[in-house]
């Protein structure tokens, strides 16, 4: 009897915690019009969407499984034909009704207290801190010693892929081609995105606070299991 009562109480507590969590999260859409939508995930992370047909993606993607975020303080202004979204870490400016995001109509700059940067579409990081590699088969330290490994030749140095963080103080993620989940009630599965030329971007500003960057990333990509 005591075990059953304890189980019931735990279920009730879990339901209350889920309800409180839902109350403290929201979509945080800062601006939307016929073709663009900007979402403030945190003071250091933005989602930027362009859709020619005006059909924005609300389904979870293979990379971004969260669409609800904690409440964030930000300022929205529309002046001189530009949309401005300002947080404590960055300012984004987009020229209204100018089409897909390009280096001519979109710019994101660091806030005064942050490591300075000025980013436009197409810019590449200079100080990526690198990530991982598909396999270490045949490696002796950072040198390939075997001939049968497809990715590298014997004697070649290990070439790490770019990672999430960089000394530049910002990270750009393009999820425009990422698979989506179909929200099937019986078995959630992946599906392709509509071939409509849409853009689904994420931008993170963090300076040298890499711990904060990792936390911001988990807000939309999910926590480590």
Where are these regions (language model features)?
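Bacterial N-terminal signal peptides that target proteins for export
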Residues: 1-8
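Boundary at the C-terminal end of the N-terminal hydrophobic targeting segment
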Residues: 19-22
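A low-complexity, Ser/Thr/Gly/Pro-enriched, surface-exposed linker/loop concept
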Residues: 41-80
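Short, exposed beta-strand/loop patches in secreted or surface proteins that constitute
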Residues: 29-31, 37-39, 72-78, 83-84, ...
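Bacterial N-terminal signal peptides
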Residues: 8-16
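Catalytic and substrate-binding clefts that recognize carbohydrates or anionic sugar/phosphate headgroups
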Residues: 78-225
